[in-house]
Every structure is written in C-alpha cells, then in structure tokens.
Amino acid sequence: MAAGSGSAAAVAAVAGGGPAGPHAAGVTAGAVTTGSGAPVPGPGAVLIGDRLYSGVLITLENCLLPEHTLRFTPSMSSGLDPDTETELRVTGCELIQAAGILLRLPQVAMATGQVLFQRFFYTKSFVKHSMEHVSMACVHLASKIEEAPRRIRDVINVFHRLRHLREKKKPVPLILDQEYVNLKNQIIKAERRVLKELGFCVHVKHPHKIIVMYLQVLECERNQHLVQTSWNYMNDSLRTDVFVRFQPESIACACIYLAARTLEIPLPNRPHWFLLFGTTEEEIQEICLKILQLYTRKKVDLSDLESKIEKKKLAIEEAKAQAKGLLPEGAPVLDNTSGFSPLPKNESPKEVKGNKPSPLPVQAMKNAKRKAEGAKRTGSNSPVNGVQKGRESRSRSGSRDQSYSRSPSRSASPKHRKSESYSTSSGSKSHSRSRSRSGSPPRQFNHSSTYKSSKMRSYKKSKDYKYSAHKARKSRSRSSSRSRSRSRERSDHSGKYKKKSHYYRNHRHERSRSYERASHRYDRDHPGHSRHRR
C-alpha cells in the first residue's frame, strides 16, 4: 500500500504484536504511534511529509483508527452533525445485514461488509458519497472477500426491494433500462473507491470464534442460551464503530460480559475473568455502552436523513459558487452588457473579475454578415436573362478577361456581373449566342456613353465602320443585329436604358480584347456582308 494514501490503514496506529508468519493475510503500512499520538522512530523509519512510517507490518490484527480521526470525521467537516452521522451509519449497516439475509450470505460476509462500511466513512463524507451506493458496494465486495460471490444484479434487486418495503410501497420489479445501467456503473465505481481509500487492506478479524473459545475456557460452552445471547450482542455491535476502536478480543469479552449480566449468570471475579484475556474493565464498559445505545435510539426515517444530506450538498455548492466569484446572493456576476438591457443599471457589482467586451454586438455583426452572404449566394444562383450567372462561355483564346455581352445582366452588384461571349467550335464555324429574356428590347443594347471616347477607337479600326450607320437604318432583321455596324445606334439609345438598368452603374474603362478578336472572326467568317457593302 502506498504510504500517505489517506486510507484507514495508512493512518492506523498499529497496536500490539499479533501473530505474523506465513499465514498472515493482511499487509499494512502503518505509522507506529504511541498512546499520545507522537510517532516513535524505529531503526528503519521512513519520514514522508510530516508522518513517520516504520515500514511494512504483516499482521492479522484489525486496523484501528487514532483518536483524532474518530473525533473529527470528514462528515463533520462537511457540516453534518454527529447525531445524523450516527444514524446514517446505523441505517447503512442495517441495510447490509438485511441484504445479506435476502442474498443468503454467510454471517461472516455480512460482518465484513459492515466493517468495511464503517472504515470507509471515516475517510470520506456522507455528504459527498451516497450511503446506499456504498452499502451495495460493500455487500458485493464482502461477498467476494469471504468466497461467497453474488452477482451485482442480485445486489441491486435486493436493495431495490428493501427500499420499497421501507417506504411501504408495493414491490415492483426493477426495469432494465438506462437508469439501471447507470446505477450498476456507479456501484462498480463505489467498490473501486472503497478499495482505494482502504488501501486494499480489507482483512477483518471477527470475534465469532473468539467468543466460543473464551466460553470454553470459562466452561460455559454448554449453556446454549449464553452462547447465543453473546453471539447476538456481537452481531449488533457491528452497527457501531467499536470495530475501528477496539480489538476483537475486547469486543468478545464485552459481549460475554453483557450477556452474562443480562441472563444473571455469575462469572469469576477474583480476579476478573477478562483480565485473563488481556482486556481492561474500562474498555468493556465503553463497548457495552455503545451496544446498549442501539436499543434506546429512536427509529429515523431514511427520507429525512436524505433530505438533510441534500441541504448540506446545496450549501456546499453555494459556498463553492461564491468562492468562484459569484455575488453574495448567489447571482452570477454578469459582464458589461449595457447594449443588451434597455434600462440603465443603478449600480454595478463591487467585485468583477475583468471587464470583457460584450459578445452581443459581435454576434449581431456576424449574423448580419451571414445574411448578406446568403443574399449574394441566392442572387448569384438565380437565373438572369435565362442564363445562370455562374455559367459563362469563354472565348477560344482562353482569356481570363470578361468578354463583351450581347445580353447585359441586370444584377444590382457589379461584382457578380458576368458577360457572355460568342462561342465558336474548333471543328465547325457555327456560332451560338444565348437569347436575352430581360425586359429590354432584344435588338437594342444599352451601352454607356463612355465607350465613345475610349473605346470607339477600336471600332474605327474595323474596315466596315463607315457603313455602320447606313446599314443600321437599312436592315432590321435578327441576322443584321449581330453585326458591329449598329454601335452608333446603340450609343444613341444608351441614355434611355441607362436610367432603367443598373448594369453600367460602375463604368468599365477597358473593353475585353476578346471582343476585337470576335469582330475580326465575324467579318472573316461572313464574307457576304462585305460583298453586300461593296
């Protein structure tokens, strides 16, 4: 066992020199102390922290707790009064005894479970650990220690029935749902915790056989009534903490003494018979008082005890919350969210950990950006003039510049305006153009007037520019609308459609070179127009 583990065995004052040898079953690393509690250094003593450990002691004796541990328990440090703690100890041991009877466990297994229960709650608090779960874990662990194992499912079913009987309800079978699985996992964890806190020192020396042996020495073993009464007192003493205070020999003498006084059976007193077994009268009287207090106590409802524990848990949680920076009333310290509240605040909390910016304006800006991006995506995916904006035909040269569009888009955002160019196939000289489905006239296009100054030079380079005005008035057919000769008429009508459309809100200062190449290809591929002009 690791020294300083906080278990009952680690803080035990190992008294007496019990039998040690090949039959020893317990291994304890104990701090050897005197009656005053001061450590006694040995030849091979080891100092760990402020405690002096003598080493490893192999013994069959029970581990006894020092007086300061018995006086100030972890439950008292959690705010639980001693009377409530005593009632919880007695109730838990009664549950273990009743469950052992229903599970048909041997009495030694039930006694081991109750002793482990008492030891555990001298290292842990009733407020932080469920009494019922620890009781189940002790029954399951004791059944394996005493070589009479029981399934954990049977242990849960038995405790479930005992709870219904205690609450005077009709017993209902336990449903195997997720709650049952969680309870099973909690019991397994509780069993692990018991082993860890006790340092895996779970050996218990019981006084059952000692009582029979002492009565044989006193020649009273034939008095079955005396033997049975002494045995009963010993079983009742398991509900007290005498097994962590006194050695089993003293407990056996106290049970015989109490049974003989109850049945009025005389025992040798000159000298006193218990002195033969190494027990003092003070120890016997203290053990007898502990046992007799069980018969004078009032029966307490377990629900009342659980309600007290819940109140203590809430008090501890509130204390922890206040220690973490909450207000005295228990309300959390809020950040500076003046933009959120419509009313001004009268006063601010006195203690604030830090002035953090309010997350509300930042979140509002993020939401606005998301809405704007969503609107742009829906606008770009919607068909304009019968063509999806994301789809465009590229010129043969593979230029990255946007080509001149025969059907201008009416999108409100200039970033998403994309134009379509004439697409020519490499195998054939056929040309395809997407039809415009907008409200504008199909044969008239609104071009900005800025094209006259900076872009008309490219038109003049064309050999058919001087006939453009004459041919525009002469032909109104759809085939003639594809020529470049109507640029002047388009520029005349640009003002009228400029007011209606927002396509040329931001003027472009450079025309794509693919338009010039497309115009040369058009003149080369349609020689009929040039002959007609001649």
From Swiss-Prot:
RS as annotated region, ranges: 400-436
Annotated region (Cyclin-like 2), positions in chain: 209-293
GO molecular function: cyclin-dependent protein serine/threonine kinase regulator activity
Compartments, as annotated in UniProt: Nucleus speckle; Nucleus, Nucleoplasm
Basic and acidic residues compositional bias, start-end: 389-399, 486-495, 512-528
Keyword Nucleus: yes
Skewed-composition ranges (Basic residues): 468-485, 496-511
Domain of life: Eukaryota
One GO cellular component term noted in the UniProt record for this chain: nucleus
PANTHER family in alphabetical order: CYCLIN
Domain notes: Contains a RS region (arginine-serine dipeptide repeat) within the C-terminal domain which is the hallmark of the SR family of splicing factors. This region probably plays a role in protein-protein interactions.
Protein's recorded name: Cyclin-L1
Species, as recorded: Gallus gallus
